[in-house]
Amino acid sequence: MTTTELVALLHLASPALPIGAFSYSQGFEAALDANLIRDADTARDWIAGGLTDVLAHGELPFLAHQLARWHAHDADALARENAWFVASRESAELRRETEQMGWSLAQLCTSLEWGDTARRATLATISPIALPTAFAYAAAAHDASADAVLAAYAFGWVENQTSAALKAVPLGQLAGQRIIVALRGAIDAAVRRALATPPDAVNTFAPQLGILSARHETQYSRLFRS
């Protein structure tokens, strides 16, 4: 990997990326309300479970396959699989989350003129666009390797979940850093599993997350949009 590719992925994984990731907890806040999360240890376990049981089977392998489709510029497959992913979101909140963040990232890519003209034209035709599809486009535009792309995406997800824990549990900064350090190995394992997953084995089934997300829509007190 070149320094330019590394910097591009650091940019994409940065919480400063203006796509609104900070406003979502992806069920974390609802799990806290249901007393599934109570302290730093249970927060770490919840985030680890989301990484290994949800992302590693669904979002990460989907991202890897969308990355390959952007490299091949297979517009039909990109649109078809993007529609499948959006439809697989199990609550209105989770669907709005991926659509809003995907749209914001796609707009950023267009404004910064990332990628060639033909692929940018294809990007503009995919609506609503899921976050992994837009992230794959941005990564492909910088010609980053699949393992590094998935690692950046997974780390960004872990960091955002940890940030939600700091605000909602609440936890201290050191406790948050301990969670991130503890999950480094799990990120590597999740990436390796995702890269070994064929397209027909991508699995986004996560009933507990779907139920918690649906409950969050009517939760009395909320900090986050999901």
Swiss-Prot record:
GO molecular-function term, one example from the UniProt record: nickel cation binding
Keywords linked to the UniProt accession: Chaperone, Cytoplasm, Nickel insertion
Pfam families noted in UniProt: UreF
The UniProt record lists the keyword Phosphoprotein: no
Subcellular location: Cytoplasm
A Gene Ontology term for the protein's cellular component: cytoplasm
Keyword hit for Cytoplasm: yes
Sequence similarity: Belongs to the UreF family.
Job description of the protein: Required for maturation of urease via the functional incorporation of the urease nickel metallocenter.
Oligomeric and partner information: UreD, UreF and UreG form a complex that acts as a GTP-hydrolysis-dependent molecular chaperone, activating the urease apoprotein by helping to assemble the nickel containing metallocenter of UreC. The UreE protein probably delivers the nickel.
Protein's name according to its UniProt entry: Urease accessory protein UreF
Organism: Burkholderia ambifaria (strain ATCC BAA-244 / DSM 16087 / CCUG 44356 / LMG 19182 / AMMD) (Burkholderia cepacia (strain AMMD))
